[in-house]
Structures are given as C-alpha cells and as structure tokens.
C-alpha cells in the first residue's frame, strides 16, 4: 500500500503558475557556473524580480531587473545576495548602509516591470503578471581541496 500524497495548500501571491527554484547565494567568492541542483552549466540572464522590502516608511514592493544565473535544465535561479543588497541600498530603500530585511517573492513579466519603472503598475497588475517560485533552496559550499593540515615541518 502506498502512502497518500499530501497536497500542500500554499498561499501564492502571483497569479501565474510558479516558476523556477530559487537560491539566494550568500557566498561572495562562489558564482555557481554549475547548477547546485543538477551540475549543469548555468547561463547569465537578466530577469525582473519582485522583492518585498521592509522600509522605515512602511513595507515596499520593489521590481528589480537583476542579473542572475539560471540553470535551464532544472529551472534553478541563483541570485547573489551581496549584489542584490547593493541594488536595494543604491535604490534608496535603506536609511542606513546596512541593507533592510527583504524577501524575493518571484519573477514578473518584462512588460509589467517596465510599467512599474514609471509608477504605472498597480498592486493588482503586479499580482496578475507575477510568478512565485516553486521552492526556495539553501546552498552550502564545500571546499574542493578540504582543510589543510596544521602540522609543523620538522
């Protein structure tokens, strides 16, 4: 007898079907030229992202066109945390040099992103043209050469 499948009833913000697995890369020196999920080569793509940012004046929904790494085989999207935080700070969404709390919610179609640049996109419009992420992944980097021994030479 098989186990019954559980249906995950997860609330979604976007109306479009979920797309991409998402990785926020916390490692400064790792650029993931190979996918952490399937080891296929990743491609550089510029994609419009929807980011929820905590702001002193109230929470904001920000549309950012960000250069990311994308695995076409398993549809994993990799965004560098440091680069994303620098864009958030440069956009004036942080009152200090420290980046605010944020969550990358999903992707949005390019046409809606362009309308959002001129403040012509409403929240309803963003939700209609947004795709949430299928899942959020966490990546741990293991050094290729292992740790060097600390033995002293003779």
Question: How should these model regions be labeled?
Answer:
Residues 24-26, 35, 89:
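A composition-biased, non-transmembrane "mature-region" signal
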Residues 49-59, 86-97:
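Short cysteine/histidine-rich metal-coordination sites, predominantly Zn2+-binding motifs
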Residues 78-86:
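Iron-sulfur (Fe-S) cluster-binding segments and ferredoxin-like electron-carrier domains
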Residues 37-40, 72-76:
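Short Cys/His-rich local motifs and their 1-3 flanking residues in nucleic-acid-associated proteins
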Residues 10-24, 48-60:
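Short Cys/His-rich Zn2+-coordinating modules
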Residues 31-64:
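Short recognition patches in nucleic-acid-associated and regulatory proteins
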Residues 29-32, 68-71:
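Residues immediately within or flanking Cys/His clusters that coordinate Zn2+
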Residues 87-154:
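Long, contiguous alpha-helical scaffold regions
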